[in-house]
Amino acid sequence: PVFYNGYRGGKEISGPSDPDDAGAIGNVPAKTTTSVHALGIENMAQQCVQGRGVMIDLHAHIGRERVAVGYDRLMRILEQDRVVVEKGDMVLLHTGFAQMILEMNRHPDGHVLENACAALDGRDRRLLQWITDSGLAALIADNYAVEAHPAVSHDGCCATLPLHEHCLFKLGIPLGEIWHLTPLAVWLRSHKRSRFLLTAPPLRLPGAVGSPAAPVATV
């Protein structure tokens, strides 16, 4: 089979040879037959990830309430804070979730955390279309999935994480999760800014589809 951009299965992209190797259920195996070769994270490490970051401070408007933020609410927040997202921007969503984890001082309360802080509504088709139309280059949050997980209930098919499907599979937009954004968000708001230089190289892991990043904001 030929994937998007003309990459070929079994050559540039190798899937698992056994379902147990997919890592979707249970423990992830120590070894894997999966490799993305041409699309490995090492390519991002070699070129680095650097450009204009744009902070959207959801926490400033919503606090730590568990809310699935759809298109309408996101647009109101952008308008109120005079935030403009342009083509090529790396968009960061500050929800306060990572800050909550740190405040629990290595004793996280799972029940509290699973009912805390905002996340994007991946089922909102207008929100997904905005991601496409805006031309943003990366979507990053300080929560564990960027979008609400489990996703908002709906009728019909299909994706468990629809925003992941839209960004990663359809558009090739990388996602960042569990970044500690609160100190930066507080500084930007106190200086009436939303933009900064973001440098966020991943680790050079040949064939891997993801990696921890080492992000630095220059203000």
Predicted segments — roles?
Residues P1-V219:
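Active-/binding-site microenvironments in catalytic and ligand-binding cores
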